[in-house]
Each structure stands twice: as structure tokens, then as C-alpha cells.
A protein has these predicted regions:
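Helix-loop-helix hairpin linking two adjacent transmembrane segments in secondary transporters
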Residues: 130-172
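Helix-breaking motifs and short loop linkers at transmembrane-helix boundaries and internal kinks
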Residues: 33-35, 67, 85-94, 105, ...
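C-terminal membrane-cytosol helix-exit motif in multi-pass small-molecule transporters
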Residues: 162-183, 434-443
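Cytoplasmic helix-loop-helix junction between adjacent transmembrane helices
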Residues: 100-134
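Paired small-residue
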Residues: 81-85, 93-102, 195, 277-285
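Transmembrane-helix exit segments and adjacent C-terminal regions of multi-pass membrane proteins
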Residues: 5, 365-447
Length: 447
């Protein structure tokens, strides 16, 4: 058990930070299962990040005067219990409430695990383990959530977290760590925390909007979408060895990372077609940028600053408030762009149906079925397969109808890809703003 203590604490950190985006690929399934609206289901994602961002600093302040292992164990237990509650939720209101409690327990767990890892490994190794676990969790969240949703259900996302968290409770209690009694000697590091917030807002476009495009826009399964977005965590993990090999100055490393994220998001905005292959290179750029920036900025925000736990709280708050800001900026944009794309898409659909080599009666029947599907799926990229599946066509008409369905799907995929373009470009702009905070001259102070 003693050897497993450190890894269990690191896994807990990764689980909590993965939860900021782990449900992204499951949102369509949650939408259908709980019979709710798009606006409400978005709060499954927003509520967790908002609560975690708001409570991280106050909890860190209180934590500085508390017994780390006791409060860590309580936080991990609350996180485990609320994860089970999420899995059992039968309404959107209950799920959102459970996510809020999960974030509260997660904040306690995150702050506590930092102190416990430092007590176990020493300050340098402990902070490094905490930061690395957070980056891994952030990068792998959508990938893991998509695979679990495809293989089992959206509830499985929360079920699998429970045993890991339960095992981490005795692991937390096993570490002897005294409260950090350092005086409040340093102000929060504004620049790295601001850069973290802006990058988190920008990464929302890659970790949230991209998977939404793959599942809702291009109608791929959550499993295939998860495998596709696995490029981001793989590239992020590869960034650290590359940085150690090249050993660039910290400011250069972060600046390059911001530029890579911006470039990757521009690449996603300019996809030439709805082919998964075209997303790989932009995702690799985003992943490399993520790996070069988030852990470095987190370390800079905490470096030589006491009390350590409080400055860790500021980094947690910056990252998750940044996610909420990113969602608040980008969601209305791509929603409006989807609505603007509806009329041109409907006109293109009508033109394709009229030009199809089908009998007039079959064209009318298919057009009516398509009209019903478009009405029922208003406000989202429609799946038109059911309209063709229910059509009563003669065998000789089936090949032409199948070709028409393929043409319509291609038209809708092009429309969806264009509808997400502005949001990806805004995400790139946020990454460039983060770059400006890195390269802007530091104000000199005199002591």
C-alpha cells in the first residue's frame, strides 16, 4: 500500500482535472437520455468548471491552517460519493447539482493532494508530480470520456472514478503531513495565471468544440471521435521530452506553445473537408502547445511563492474560470453560426432532391420526410438517415436514393465545418492574446 500512495494521489489529481472536459463527448447521449435541452445540458460541463474555479482559492486559504491528510481524505470521499451520484442521476437538475458537489470535493482533493505529494516526495518532486498529473488529466479527459460512452454509457464515465477515489482515501490518510504555516509573503503571480486563463479559454475550442464538430457535425460515434482527439494528449505527452532535449528558456517555451495552439486552431478553422485525417496535424500542434505551456505556467505561478497551497489554488481558479469564459464566448458564436447555416443548407438540400434521378412521387415523399427531420432537429446539424430509412422506394430506386443521401450528408458536413470556423478563429485569437501576455515587457520594480 505504501508504494501505491503517491500514484493514487496523482491519479486523483488527474481524475479531478479530467472532469473539466470528460463529459464533452457524452453530452449528446445525456441530452437524449435525460430528455433535456442543449442549453441545460451545457451546464453539466459549465457547472463543474465554474464551481471549481470559484472555490479553489477560498479552500486553499482555509487549507493552509488545516490538517492536510484529514481534509484531503474528506475531499476525495466527497468526490467519490458525488461521482456515484452523477451516475445515478435521472434528471438534468440532479446531474448538475451532483456535478457542483463533485467540483467542491474535487477542489479539496486537488489542494490536499499537492501538500500530500510534497510531504511524500519533497517540494520539487511533489509539485512536479502534481502539475504533470493535472496536464495528463486535462489532455486525456475527452478521449477517456468518449471511449467509455461508446463502450458502455455516459454513466460509466462517473462509475469508473469511484473505485480509484475510494482507494485514494486511505492513501491520503497514510501520509503524515503538517499544515503549511508559511506566512502570506507573496502576491499571486498575475502574468502566468492570466496566461493560463487565456490558454484555457482557447483550449476550450480544441477540447470542446472539436469533439462537438466530430460527433454532432460529422455524425461520428463517440468512440471514433475519442480515438481521433487522442492526438492531443499523445502530442502533449511528447512535448515534455522535446522541451528537455532542446532546453529553451522558459519564456520562449511558453511563447512557442501559445503560438502552436493558435496555429492548430487556425488549422481546424480552415479544414478543407470533413475528413478526420485533416484534423490530425492541427490537433498535434494544439497538443504540443498544451504540453509546452500548462505545466510550465503552473510551475511559474507557484515557484518560490508562499504559502504554496494558496498559489496552487490561484492556478486552479485561473484554469477553470478560463474554461467557463471560453465556453461563454464560443458557445453563442457557433450556435448563431449553426442557425445562420440552416437556410442555405435547406436550399442546397432542396436543389439536390430536385436534381436527383428519382421518380417525382419518390422525390415528394423523400422531401416530406426530410422536412420533418429538419423541423424535429432544428438548432443542430440534422441526421437525415431516418428519412431515407423510412422511405417506401422501389428496389431500382434505392441506388439513386443512397447516392442522394451521401450527397446530402456531404452538404451538411460542409455546412457544419463552416459553422464552426469563426469559433476556432476566436479560440486562436485567445491563444494569441495569451502569447502577448508572455512577450509583453515586464514592468521593472525597485525594492
Amino acid at each position: 500500500m505504501r508504494r501505491a500512495v503517491g500514484p493514487l494521489l496523482a491519479v486523483t489529481v488527474a481524475l479531478v482535472l479530467a472532469d473539466s472536459a470528460v463529459v464533452t463527448l457524452a453530452l449528446p447521449d445525456i441530452l437524449r437520455h435525460l430528455d433535456t435541452s442543449v442549453g441545460q445540458v451545457a451546464w453539466v460541463l459549465i457547472s463543474f468548471n465554474l464551481v471549481l474555479g470559484l472555490v479553489a482559492v477560498p479552500i486553499a486559504v482555509v487549507f493552509g491552517r488545516a490538517q492536510p491528510r484529514f481534509f484531503s481524505a474528506v475531499g476525495i470521499a466527497v468526490f467519490a460519493g458525488s461521482s456515484a451520484w452523477c451516475a445515478l442521476a435521472q434528471s438534468i437538475e440532479v446531474l448538475i447539482a451532483a456535478r457542483c458537489v463533485q467540483a467542491l470535493g474535487g477542489a479539496l482533493a486537488l489542494v490536499g493532494c499537492l501538500e500530500l505529494l510534497v510531504a511524500k516526495y519533497g517540494a520539487r518532486r511533489g509539485v512536479a508530480a502534481w502539475v504533470t498529473a493535472g496536464v495528463v488529466g486535462t489532455a486525456t479527459g475527452p478521449f477517456a470520456g468518449g471511449l467509455l460512452t461508446q463502450a458502455f454509457s455516459w454513466q460509466a464515465i462517473f462509475v469508473v472514478q469511484v473505485p480509484f477515489a475510494v482507494l485514494a482515501v486511505p492513501a491520503a490518510l497514510a501520509v503524515r503531513a503538517a499544515p503549511e504555516l508559511s506566512p502570506d509573503r507573496h502576491r499571486p503571480a498575475v502574468r502566468p495565471n492570466l496566461t493560463l486563463a487565456l490558454l484555457s479559454a482557447a483550449l476550450t475550442a480544441a477540447l470542446f468544440l472539436l469533439v462537438l464538430l466530430l460527433v454532432e457535425g460529422w455524425h461520428h460515434s463517440p468512440g471514433l471521435a475519442a480515438l481521433t482527439v487522442s492526438v492531443v494528449p499523445v502530442a502533449a505527452l511528447g512535448a515534455r521530452p522535446l522541451a528537455r532535449l532542446l532546453q529553451p528558456p522558459a519564456q520562449v517555451e511558453v511563447a512557442v506553445g501559445c503560438f502552436l495552439i493558435a496555429g492548430g486552431l487556425v488549422g481546424l478553422a480552415l479544414l478543407p473537408s470533413a475528413d478526420l485525417v485533416w484534423t490530425i496535424a492541427p490537433q498535434a500542434l494544439v497538443g504540443l502547445g498544451l504540453g509546452l505551456t500548462v505545466d510550465r505556467l503552473t510551475s511559474q505561478a507557484m515557484e518560490m511563492r508562499l504559502p504554496r497551497v494558496r498559489h496552487a489554488g490561484w492556478t486552479i481558479s485561473a484554469r477553470h474560470i478560463g474554461v467557463v469564459v471560453g465556453l461563454a464566448i464560443l458557445t453563442p458564436v457557433f450556435t448563431a453560426d449553426l442557425q445562420d447555416a440552416e437556410v442555405p443548407a435547406q436550399e442546397a438540400i432542396a436543389s439536390l432532391v430536385l436534381d436527383a434521378p428519382l421518380k417525382p412521387d419518390d422525390k415528394i415523399a423523400i422531401a416530406q420526410s426530410l422536412g420533418r427531420e429538419l423541423t424535429q432537429q432544428q438548432g443542430q446539424v440534422p441526421d437525415l438517415h431516418r428519412a431515407f430509412e423510412t422511405a417506401d422506394l422501389a428496389p431500382e430506386e434505392r441506388p439513386a436514393a443512397a447516392q442522394l443521401e451521401r450527397d446530402l450528408d456531404e452538404q451538411l458536413e460542409r455546412a457544419a465545418t463552416r459553422a464552426f470556423r469563426d469559433s476556432f478563429l476566436i479560440g486562436a485569437g485567445l491563444a494569441l492574446l495569451a502569447l502577448l501576455t508572455v512577450v509583453a515587457p515586464h514592468r521593472k520594480t525597485t525594492s
